């Protein structure tokens, strides 16, 4: 432009000199927000159709604009859009290309709309789609866990506290613990959807608009549950993204804990499970290695998602109402976190059905470490011995077993009675790990029958 104004800027009328070239690159977001194009165009089509219906712009112009937007969408679908930092973001790219196709009438599209409510709408549409994909992926992983638990519901393994053998449980019970964690994750995402699914469009820059919009019809077209009812709030907050990141972070924490156990259990020091070869890699120098790369990567990627949550929280904490350019920085963190979560869910969903528990190793480990000591204490309590006294008695018996180098079921009845004469011959029935496991039949317990009941309920929940 001969007058030195910013070339091609839809906001350039106010300015007397072009934007600094590095500032264009520094402030552009097209490298990462291009993914919003379908949501942006969908929102624009719904907005434009409403402008025509309301008589705010001529119906013929609305139809031309919508046809042009559909053409732009097709071009981007086919990879024909050429991106430029000069156009800043996907919203400007779409409008600029629309202008090239249909001419100045394209400028009517932005009537009664700001990039502030436009971006907020696009972001919510995008996150809604991602949320729906995430909850479906959670269900897939839950299904894999349930099938694995059902197949190995009877397999006895050690349960740990402080990384020490505590009480025997079943492999199925352990897998169902992760099912329950994921069930709550599913609930968190589902619970937030109604809060996410509110439409900001029509709020304009911050104060609303003087045009007679029909926001409700646009909301219905875009499948929103309702409207953002305060224009300042609609364009100013990103709590919906923060809530999404918090749910993602919690989900990833659960996947990380599962990953940690898979890494330990597959190590030669444990040999509790075998991971499928297709989800492991080898070493460039040590030919014997089978490395659990998938769980390790999932465990490592948690930091990215935690970082995204912290990033958006920190970004928003000091911003006065309404929109500030700082808020552009929410997208990259959120996009990366969502991509990471979906990838981790997918790879776990594919890997989990192929996990092979090593039954004999697990059973042997379950019997070590005096894991039935609590059962012995419970046995004494049933003889009307106060639990604290029973605890002391069993502690003495454990020390005796340690000194003899045997487990509890390796002690003779005479050994046991030398500590407390109230112990009788029926004690042998409760010292095996099988008895310990199957005695825990209360809801939530690890008895095989109880676990199978939990599995049946889970299959009903998942419609398996």
Swiss-Prot record:
Disulfide links within the chain: none
Transmembrane parts of this sequence: none
Superkingdom, natural source: Bacteria
Enzyme Commission number(s) of this protein: 4.3.2.1
Main subcellular localisation: cytoplasm
GO cellular component terms attached to this protein's record: cytosol
UniProt keyword Cytoplasm present: yes
One GO BP: arginine biosynthetic process via ornithine
Record-linked PANTHER family: ARGININOSUCCINATE LYASE (PTHR43814:SF1)
Family designation: Belongs to the lyase 1 family. Argininosuccinate lyase subfamily.
UniProt name for this protein: Argininosuccinate lyase
Organism this protein belongs to: Magnetococcus marinus (strain ATCC BAA-1437 / JCM 17883 / MC-1)
Gene (UniProt): argH
């Amino acid at each position: 432009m001969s007058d030195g104004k910013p070339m091609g800027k839809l906001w350039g009328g106010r300015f007397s000199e072009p934007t600094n070239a590095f500032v264009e690159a520094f402030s552009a977001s097209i490298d990462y927000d291009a993914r919003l194009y379908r949501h942006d165009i969908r929102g624009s089509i719904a907005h434009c159709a409403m402008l025509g219906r309301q008589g705010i712009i001529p119906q013929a112009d609305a139809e031309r604009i919508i046809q042009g937007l559909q053409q732009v969408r097709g071009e981007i679908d086919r990879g024909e859009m050429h991106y430029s930092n000069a156009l800043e973001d996907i919203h400007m790219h779409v409008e600029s290309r629309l202008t090239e196709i249909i001419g100045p009438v394209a400028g009517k599209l932005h009537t009664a709309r700001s990039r502030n409510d436009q971006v907020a709408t696009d972001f919510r549409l995008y996150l809604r789609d991602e949320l729906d994909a995430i909850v479906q992926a959670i269900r897939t992983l839950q299904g894999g866990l349930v099938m694995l638990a059902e197949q190995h519901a009877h397999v006895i393994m050690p349960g740990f506290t402080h990384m020490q053998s505590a009480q025997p449980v079943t492999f199925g019970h352990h897998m169902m613990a992760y099912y329950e964690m994921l069930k709550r994750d599913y609930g968190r995402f589902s619970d937030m959807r109604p809060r996410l699914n509110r439409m900001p469009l029509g709020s304009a820059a911050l104060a609303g608009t003087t045009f007679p919009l029909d926001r409700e019809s646009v909301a219905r077209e875009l499948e929103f549950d309702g409207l953002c009812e305060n224009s300042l709030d609609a364009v100013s907050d990103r709590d919906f993204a923060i809530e999404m990141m918090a749910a993602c972070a919690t989900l990833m924490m659960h996947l990380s804990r599962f990953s940690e156990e898979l890494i330990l259990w597959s190590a030669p020091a444990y040999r509790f499970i075998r991971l499928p070869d297709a989800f492991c890699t080898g070493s460039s120098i040590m030919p014997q290695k089978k490395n659990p790369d998938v769980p390790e990567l999932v465990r490592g990627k948690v930091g990215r998602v935690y970082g995204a949550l912290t990033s958006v929280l920190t970004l928003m904490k000091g911003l006065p109402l309404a929109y500030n350019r700082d808020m552009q920085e929410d997208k990259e963190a959120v996009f990366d976190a969502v991509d990471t979560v979906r990838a981790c869910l997918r790879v776990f969903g594919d890997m989990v059905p192929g996990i092979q528990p090593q039954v004999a190793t697990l059973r042997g480990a379950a019997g070590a470490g005096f894991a039935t000591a609590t059962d012995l204490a419970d046995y004494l309590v049933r003889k009307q011995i106060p639990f604290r006294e029973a605890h002391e008695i069993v502690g003495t018996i454990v020390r005796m077993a340690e000194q003899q180098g045997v487990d509890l079921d390796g002690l003779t009845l005479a050994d046991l009675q030398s500590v407390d004469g109230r112990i009788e011959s029926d004690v042998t029935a409760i010292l095996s790990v099988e008895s310990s496991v199957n005695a825990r039949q209360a809801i939530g317990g690890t008895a095989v029958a109880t676990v199978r009941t939990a599995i049946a309920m889970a299959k009903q929940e998942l419609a398996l």
